[in-house]
Amino acid sequence: AESSAMKFERQHVDSGGSSSSNANYCNEMMKKREMTKDRCKPVNTFVHEPLAEVQAVCSQRNVSCKNGQTNCYQSYSSMHITECRLTSGSKFPNCSYRTSQAQKSIIVACEGKPYVPVHFDNSV
């Protein structure tokens, strides 16, 4: 079975990628990374930084998660990210996404040994 850490990588890390010149980025990636298999995942963020840098956030600024848990961490620096949002009127299996890029600090929930990201909480 896929571990939480592996699922995080599949859903949120695209180190070499960029959506800068590709308005279709989210449509392609959401499908490729299997987030449109049984439903259209409504919102998803991809981080275009090396995996090691994303994992390192687990030792950065400790903050509260949206759900009140205390195992969230905010990156000290802003990261190159792409936010994918389902367009209104889009219906499974024809999932259609709006692609927008940003430079933001990311907030992830971490757990396990090694202590690694398992959930993408927010970007600020």
UniProtKB/Swiss-Prot annotation:
The EC number(s) this enzyme carries: 4.6.1.18
Signal sequence annotation: none
Catalysed reactions listed for this entry: an [RNA] containing cytidine + H2O = an [RNA]-3'-cytidine-3'-phosphate + a 5'-hydroxy-ribonucleotide-3'-[RNA]; an [RNA] containing uridine + H2O = an [RNA]-3'-uridine-3'-phosphate + a 5'-hydroxy-ribonucleotide-3'-[RNA]
PANTHER family named in the record: RIBONUCLEASE, RIBONUCLEASE PANCREATIC
Protein keywords: Disulfide bond, Endonuclease, Hydrolase, Lyase, Nuclease, Secreted
UniProt-recorded name of the protein: Ribonuclease pancreatic A
Disordered: annotated span: 1-24
SMART domains for this protein: RNAse_Pc
GO cellular component: extracellular region
